[in-house]
C-alpha cells in the first residue's frame, strides 16, 4: 500500500475525519448517508483505502462541506 504512506494520502484521511467529526457524525452515520458499509469509512479514515477525486467530492458534500475548501486543507497539510 505504497500510496497510502504519502503525506497527501494521510492528509486526505485526516481532513475527511476532521470534517466528519465537525459535522457531528459517527462513521456509521456518515456511511448511512452514503449508503455504504461503515467499514468503508473506517478504511478511508485509517488510510487503508484511497479515494478518487469524484469520491472525495461526494464524501465532502455528504458532510455538508465544500470540496474545494477540504482540498485546500489537504494541500496545507502536505
PLM regions: where:
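Short, charged recognition helix plus adjacent turn
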Residues: 1-2, 61, 69-78
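Short alpha-helical DNA-recognition segment
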Residues: 24-46
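DNA major-groove recognition helix of helix-turn-helix
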Residues: 45, 55, 63
